[in-house]
A protein has these predicted regions:
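Conserved acidic, metal-coordinating active-site core of Asp-based
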Residues: 130, 134-190
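Alpha-helical substrate-recognition element adjacent to the catalytic core
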Residues: 1-145
Length: 190
């Protein structure tokens, strides 16, 4: 008999780690305080009537250029090694997987975060996630940021609950139709 799948979805910032992920390595590399950086993000959000997530992504790029801090996929992933977790997080995944096995279910872990995907990919817990849905940048052939590739704001997070539930995990030109199509409960993957 096929094991039922139980999906556990996590936010990242202030849920698995103790503060916003940018505050461990990125903001210090700019020589700024967290309050100054987020203050600028909020001021831009208000002045431009802008999505707060796009505003922080813009400010990350703007401030990195201004302070001559190189940011690439690789540097973001290295910043992931600086993330600090709440007590028990590092052992949680293996413990809950073992419990799932004991009770006859397969446990899958997913991230649905407004944080930076590349930083999460560089964390020591990234290997436990089947899929990481988070804000992401597009890079040129030199590895430099070109544009926001994906922004996961607070209301957009719900689409990932449906993606996981229906088993439409890939984001591509064909997935929107599959995602929006009615799927009877008994045909859903999770």
């Amino acid at each position: 008999m096929k094991q039922p799948i139980v999906a556990i979805m996590y936010d990242f910032d202030k849920t698995l780690c103790t503060k916003d992920m940018q505050e461990y390595a990125f903001i210090p590399a700019l020589g700024m305080s967290s309050s100054a950086f987020w203050g600028e993000v909020n001021a831009m959000t208000d002045a431009e009537e802008m999505d707060n997530i796009l505003a922080y992504m813009y400010k990350m790029v703007e401030k990195a250029k201004e302070k001559k801090v190189p940011i690439t996929r690789d540097t973001f992933q290295k910043m992931g090694s600086k993330v600090e977790y709440f007590d028990g997080v590092k052992t949680w995944f293996e413990r809950i997987n073992a419990y799932g096995e004991k009770v006859g279910v397969r446990v899958e872990h997913y991230i649905v975060s407004s944080g930076i995907k590349e930083i999460i990919e560089g964390t020591e817990i990234a290997r436990f996630f089947k899929k990481i849905y988070a804000c992401e940048f597009m890079y040129d052939y030199n590895g430099s940021i070109q544009w926001p590739k994906f922004a996961v704001n607070y209301t957009a997070k719900t689409q990932f609950l449906f993606r996981i539930n229906k088993g439409v995990l890939t984001i591509d030109s064909k997935s929107a139709d599959k995602l929006n199509r009615f799927t009877p409960e008994n045909e859903r993957r999770v």
